[in-house]
C-alpha cells in the first residue's frame, strides 16, 4: 500500500458526515470544533498550490451537537486553481478522492466578488448554480452547472440569517488570475450574482460522483473594486469568522436529517 493509499484510508476510516472545501483565507474551524487528525494534501497525492491564504491540509474535526450527537467533518483547507497551471482533472482530484472515501455531502466555499445587488461585502451568497466560463462554451450560452435545488440554497440562506443574501444565487467561474474590469463586471452580471476563480471543477466532480453539494460564496469585495489577492486576503479574517459561525448551520440546513437515527 502506498503512502497516499494509507492517507486516503485515514479519511475513509473517519467516516465524515460531510466535507467542506475552504477558499482563500477561510480556514477558521467551525465554532466548538476540535481537530482529531490532520492529513496534508501532499500525503494524499492531491495538488497543493502556492497561492497565499491556503493551507493544503485536510482537518478531521468533530463538532458537538444536540442530544450527545457529534457532527464529523472533513475540512479541506485550501484549493489549487486553474490559473496556477493545474489541469481540470487535477483540480477535480480532491472531490473525487473525498467521494471515494465515502463522502456524500460537500460544502464548497470561496472568497468572491459581488457582481450585482443584493450581493454585498461581508455576506454569504448561497449558490444553486455555477456558470462555467473556465471552459469555452459549446454554443452561444455558457454552461450552467447545477449545485443544488434553488429551494435547498434558499433554506441554507435562511439558516444563516442576516449573514446571507436571501434566496438562491448564481456563481460565475472565470479563469483569472486577473481581477475584473468595470466593463467585464457589467457583462458578467448578466449571468450571475458573484464571480470568482474556482468551484466549477469541484461542482463538476461532485455531480459525476453523486456527491450532494452546497456552495457558500463569501463576498470579499465588489467586483472591479479590488486590485490584488492581498486585498482579498485582508477581507479573509472577517469572512473566516462568518464561515466559522455559519458552516454547521449551513450543513444542517442543507441536510436536515443528517444526524437522525
Task: Describe the residue ranges of each PLM region.
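Generic non-transmembrane alpha-helical segments
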Residues: 10, 155-164, 242, 246-254
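Non-catalytic positions within long, well-ordered alpha-helices that form the structural scaffold/packing
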Residues: 98-102, 189, 207
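Active-site rim beta-loop-alpha module in soluble metabolic enzymes
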Residues: 147-190
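Zn-dependent metallopeptidase/amidohydrolase metal-coordination segment
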Residues: 197-234
Amino acid at each position: 500500500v502506498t503512502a497516499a493509499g494509507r492517507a486516503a484510508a485515514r479519511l475513509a476510516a473517519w467516516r465524515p458526515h460531510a466535507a467542506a472545501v475552504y477558499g482563500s483565507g477561510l480556514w477558521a474551524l467551525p465554532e466548538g470544533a476540535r481537530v482529531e487528525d490532520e492529513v496534508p494534501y501532499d500525503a494524499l497525492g492531491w495538488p497543493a498550490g502556492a497561492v497565499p491564504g491556503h493551507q493544503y491540509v485536510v482537518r478531521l474535526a468533530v463538532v458537538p451537537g444536540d442530544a450527545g450527537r457529534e457532527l464529523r467533518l472533513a475540512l479541506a483547507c485550501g484549493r489549487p486553481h486553474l490559473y496556477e497551471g493545474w489541469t481540470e482533472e487535477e483540480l477535480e482530484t480532491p472531490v473525487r478522492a473525498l467521494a471515494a472515501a465515502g463522502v456524500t455531502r460537500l460544502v464548497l466555499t470561496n472568497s468572491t466578488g459581488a457582481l450585482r445587488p443584493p450581493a454585498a461585502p461581508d455576506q454569504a451568497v448561497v449558490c444553486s448554480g455555477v456558470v462555467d466560463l473556465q471552459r469555452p462554451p459549446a454554443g452561444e450560452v455558457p454552461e450552467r452547472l447545477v449545485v443544488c435545488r434553488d429551494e435547498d440554497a434558499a433554506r441554507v440562506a435562511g439558516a444563516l440569517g442576516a449573514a446571507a443574501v436571501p434566496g438562491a444565487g448564481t456563481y460565475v467561474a472565470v479563469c483569472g488570475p486577473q481581477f475584473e474590469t468595470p466593463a467585464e463586471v457589467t457583462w458578467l452580471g448578466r449571468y450571475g450574482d458573484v464571480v470568482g476563480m474556482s468551484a466549477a471543477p469541484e461542482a463538476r466532480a461532485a455531480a459525476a460522483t453523486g456527491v450532494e453539494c452546497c456552495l457558500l460564496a463569501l463576498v470579499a469585495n465588489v467586483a472591479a473594486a479590488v486590485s490584488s489577492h492581498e486585498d482579498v486576503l485582508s477581507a479573509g479574517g472577517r469572512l473566516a469568522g462568518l464561515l466559522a459561525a455559519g458552516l454547521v448551520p449551513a450543513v444542517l440546513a442543507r441536510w436536515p436529517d443528517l444526524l437522525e437515527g
